[in-house]
Amino acid sequence: MARVKGGTVTRKRRKRILKLAKGYRGAKHIQFKVAKDQVMKSYLYAFRDRRRRKSDFRRLWIARINAAARINDISYSQLMHGLKLANVDVNRKMLADLAVNDADAFKALVDTAKKALA
């Protein structure tokens, strides 16, 4: 029986990994063994950071809301508590957008929160 070397299958598999490793520095985009390890690690980073992105954005929104709230003489925690007491159902993403792009609307929400706290 003839020996099967599997050249095309191996070449296709290696080509696929090296294509995924495009743009990596050093041997990581040239050598198959190193590229394979780096591609696997990259998938792990991507998986982890897709979950981490959610908390990163939440932290960014809170920082923006806090900065805008302190300009209006109220802390972030007091603002959120006041909005909850006033039954204003606005999430942090929307609040941060208002704080950056529409200062007047944000000021109106701050006034609503202050009235609810008083």
Curated annotation (Swiss-Prot):
<keyword id="KW-0689">Ribosomal protein</keyword>
<dbReference type="Pfam" id="PF00453">
    <property type="entry name" value="Ribosomal_L20"/>
</dbReference>
<protein>
    <recommendedName>
        <fullName>Large ribosomal subunit protein bL20</fullName>
    </recommendedName>
</protein>
<comment type="function">
    <text>Binds directly to 23S ribosomal RNA and is necessary for the in vitro assembly process of the 50S ribosomal subunit. It is not involved in the protein synthesizing functions of that subunit.</text>
</comment>
<comment type="similarity">
    <text>Belongs to the bacterial ribosomal protein bL20 family.</text>
</comment>
<dbReference type="GO" id="GO:0019843">
    <property type="term" value="F:rRNA binding"/>
</dbReference>
<keyword id="KW-0699">rRNA-binding</keyword>
<dbReference type="GO" id="GO:1990904">
    <property type="term" value="C:ribonucleoprotein complex"/>
</dbReference>
<keyword id="KW-0694">RNA-binding</keyword>
<keyword id="KW-0687">Ribonucleoprotein</keyword>
<dbReference type="GO" id="GO:0000027">
    <property type="term" value="P:ribosomal large subunit assembly"/>
</dbReference>
<dbReference type="GO" id="GO:0005840">
    <property type="term" value="C:ribosome"/>
</dbReference>
<dbReference type="GO" id="GO:0003735">
    <property type="term" value="F:structural constituent of ribosome"/>
</dbReference>
<dbReference type="InterPro" id="IPR035566">
    <property type="entry name" value="Ribosomal_protein_bL20_C"/>
</dbReference>
<dbReference type="InterPro" id="IPR005813">
    <property type="entry name" value="Ribosomal_bL20"/>
</dbReference>
<dbReference type="GO" id="GO:0006412">
    <property type="term" value="P:translation"/>
</dbReference>
<dbReference type="InterPro" id="IPR049946">
    <property type="entry name" value="RIBOSOMAL_L20_CS"/>
</dbReference>
